[in-house]
């Protein structure tokens, strides 16, 4: 009888401890092959907009995922596809999204153009809902030319603290910044008359991202080849979105015990908190297909001087974080 009582107390204690442990997201956080994730928050929901990771001719749509807590994710399939964008035929990549004037603007690259005479580049979808469906906003690419050697892909829309919106983009080892018109129908020249300013830092390849913390502009990007194990994320800091950006170092990379090819990321900040998450893709151990990439999330921290602490990629992911509480 005493043994049964002791066992009951023990199991009740273990159950109490388990109830106190936060649920973890696990990594990857969504099922399927997805890369280049754009993470953001709309209302009390987290959203992720990734690239469908497949051969270019199969990349003819974009899916989205939403969650109230970083643990339970809902898939929103085909929020936009090439049937809605007549000039897009393949290689729909690296979505970036902003909400403005009660509309959601989904920026994406399509067709993987190799020179300015080809059809394709960076386009915009528009919807009155974050889960779409999105229709072609302009009926043509927003940007379809090479400037300063930058392939028009990997777009990021940066909303500065003065209210201005900038397009930061570029592949092939070059990155440009351009000020968007208020209605996103084109670009406004800077005071010197230049429309596209190159801000390429050392070792930049693709996948730019920018945010502001404590008055400093953090510029992040991916280095290495996306199909290899050494894909990684580095960063720089400056007092302006135009730099100059001097490379500080790598903050996200492979862990031979966890995964390889960790890169092409985005950053989520909890509103009103100095609490940060990095959303990125990586390749599971043992996978040799370049397109076998999965979307993951981990915490991102800063040291006392404001430098980013190198991220530890994990299998556990992050703890449940409900935005409504």
Predicted feature locations:
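Bacterial Sec-dependent N-terminal signal peptides
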Residues: 1-21
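Carbohydrate-active catalytic/glycan-binding domains of CAZyme proteins
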Residues: 19-325
């Amino acid at each position: 009888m005493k043994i049964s009582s002791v066992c009951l107390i023990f199991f009740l204690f273990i159950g109490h401890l388990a109830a106190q442990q936060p649920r973890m997201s696990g990594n990857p956080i969504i099922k399927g092959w997805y890369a280049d994730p754009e993470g953001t928050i709309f209302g009390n929901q987290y959203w992720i907009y990734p690239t469908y990771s497949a051969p270019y001719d199969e990349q003819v749509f974009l899916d989205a995922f939403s969650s109230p807590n970083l643990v339970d994710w809902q898939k929103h399939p085909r929020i936009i596809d090439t049937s809605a964008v007549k000039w897009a035929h393949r290689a729909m990549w690296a979505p970036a999204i902003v909400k403005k004037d009660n509309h959601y603007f989904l920026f994406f690259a399509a067709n993987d153009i190799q020179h300015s005479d080809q059809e394709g580049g960076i386009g915009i979808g528009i919807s009155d809902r974050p889960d779409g469906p999105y229709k072609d906003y302009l009926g043509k690419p927003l940007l379809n030319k090479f400037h300063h050697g930058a392939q028009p892909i990997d777009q990021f829309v940066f909303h500065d603290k003065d209210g201005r919106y900038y397009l930061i983009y570029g592949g092939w080892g070059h990155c440009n910044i351009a000020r968007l018109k208020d209605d996103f129908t084109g670009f406004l020249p800077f005071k010197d008359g230049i429309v596209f300013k190159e801000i390429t830092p050392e070792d930049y390849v693709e996948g730019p991202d920018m945010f502001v913390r404590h008055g400093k502009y953090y510029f992040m990007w991916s280095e290495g080849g996306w199909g290899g194990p050494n894909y990684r994320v580095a960063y720089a800091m400056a007092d302006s979105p135009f730099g100059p950006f001097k490379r500080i170092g790598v903050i996200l990379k492979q862990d031979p015990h966890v995964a390889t090819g960790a890169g092409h990321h985005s950053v989520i900040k909890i509103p009103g908190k100095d609490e940060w998450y990095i959303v990125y893709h990586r390749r599971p151990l043992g996978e040799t297909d370049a397109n076998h990439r999965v979307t993951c999330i981990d915490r991102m921290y800063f040291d006392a001087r404001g430098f980013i602490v190198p991220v530890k990629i994990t299998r556990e992911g992050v703890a449940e974080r409900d935005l409504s509480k």
